[in-house]
């Protein structure tokens, strides 16, 4: 049975970011894959819900004026790494006209597609968070700390949600920028936990 008191929030664990040779490879990202797998395994086991963001770009997206082309729809690089995927996955496009089924939360993993850095630009993100309720705690991990991780965590905090960053399951492009982002999140109320602590939190809440 899923624990709805805690939700894991995985940020952009995609081939182009996570794997050497990816179009926008984050140096060192492959080192956090084992911890991502450990966290996602809990969703595979039906222990809790996993929400993921995923870049799904078109070839001419405006973001490519700032960053090299990456995660283009239909290319291998847009795929979430196998270690970041559960078995029952439901993808939600960045399209406000798309209707979500009542059974959306019956899945192990919900993937929110985006074409910008901020997952809350997908209009369905707000609705998913609202439907999960204000008492849900979010454990955030993935890449990149100073961009998409920061915006996802801050977006949740701004909406009154409790957020913890899984500190050994994140990676940054530039260390100084990543540290600045984490300091800001800490000042806003984010906590920091290890993968071991995150897994123990789920087990502890489930036992209550």
Task: Cite the ranges covered by each PLM segment.
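Residues at the starts of beta-strands that form the adenosine-phosphate
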Residues: 5, 49, 137, 161-164
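Extreme N-terminal starter segment of soluble prokaryotic enzymes
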Residues: 2-8
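Short glycine-enriched, charge-decorated loop/helix-capping segments at active-site entrances
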Residues: 21-29, 66-71
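Short acidic-hydrophobic, aromatic-tinged amphipathic segments that line or gate anion-handling sites
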Residues: 112, 190-201
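Histidine-anchored nucleotide/phosphate-binding helix
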Residues: 36-42, 147-158
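A short glycine-rich beta-strand->turn/loop micro-motif centered on a GG-aromatic cluster
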Residues: 139-142, 161-175
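Active-site alpha/beta core segments
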Residues: 34-137
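Short amphipathic alpha-helix with an adjacent loop that forms part of the alpha/beta core around
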Residues: 123-134, 196-208
